[in-house]
């Protein structure tokens, strides 16, 4: 754990809303995003979230352009230096308060964008509880496939359909084969689901043909966002063999707009997942003593649901990245182990973050046992899977005694009716 004055829990900001209990964006956070003032003819540009305000980086002379890829490419040393300077500027003891007040934009007046241009997107399968739960529905006697505890499994996702929080999600159509049908049909998905995930935004990256050693892996991660990997389970069930997910996943993925840097998350590091007795140890390229000691991050992820009839969202689950079988450093090391090159702004998904308890399951597929036990919502409605008009809201939080509590904002999306019946 590498701490500095920016992590001091006693630190206060002259932006009063940043000092409020429960604030997602206290001065100890300082996440980066892309914004412009709503209704104004002006370019989108970089900003830093502080309380309920955005500090305009362009006004400070840091012109990122419409994405943060350039900042990510500079590496953690540069972003760490910038973070420390921003902390000094926004501190209650700052000598620049009067000047900086002019550079604040209220979040309510801002339009937020995807923070980076995403060239490539890989989605992993690090949540062992999710993998076991899903496998148990398909293979009750052998829920985990033999390779799971040896290799950080993943697949190549679709970058073009990644959208920022608040973007509506159209119910997809695809090939579905009902159990009693002789042939598949093309129809709107009736088993639309969410997946509670985190997304990790790549920093400088590596040259083609040059793997990133696990000991250096976190130097190539700019920060973390919330990620909802929408999934059409009925389409997925028919198409995924033998090559894995395709159209069941590629129609939409929702991200939160603020990138929380790894430096902000230092106080919430924890040990890697404790493997069961008899589990194999990681192969040498995935093994690092420091990573095993503190390569995990205790980032809590909550999923909330709001229906057209139920205006107050209800929490469906709360999981944590600390329950992932594989660490972030292992994900990066494995992704690049064959020489694959990561580029600034590339996205690595964690996979669904389910915990060991019923209230920590990160998908409706698990919560409802594939629709067999529908959820009963407070207003009396029932849900086996998502219905048109439902809004899913993902929230993230880091809390640890002796440190400030940080948030990630939201990754929200509302389901629109399918174009295909």
Predicted features by range, described:
Residues 46, 53-54, 197, 347, ...:
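Residue-level marker of beta-strand positions
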Residues 325-337, 344, 348-391, 395-397, ...:
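Active-site pocket scaffolds in enzymes
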Residues 186-191, 339-340, 383:
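Exposed beta-sheet edge/beta-hairpin loop segments within beta-rich domains
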Residues 6-37, 49, 55, 59-318, ...:
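Active-site microenvironments in enzyme catalytic cores
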Residues 309-320, 364, 406-410:
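Local beta-strand/beta-hairpin segments that build beta-sheet-rich folds
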Residues 414-416:
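Short beta-strand edge segments in extracellular beta-sheet folds
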Residues 120-127, 341, 346-350:
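Conserved phosphate/anionic-ligand binding catalytic regions in large, soluble enzymes, centered on
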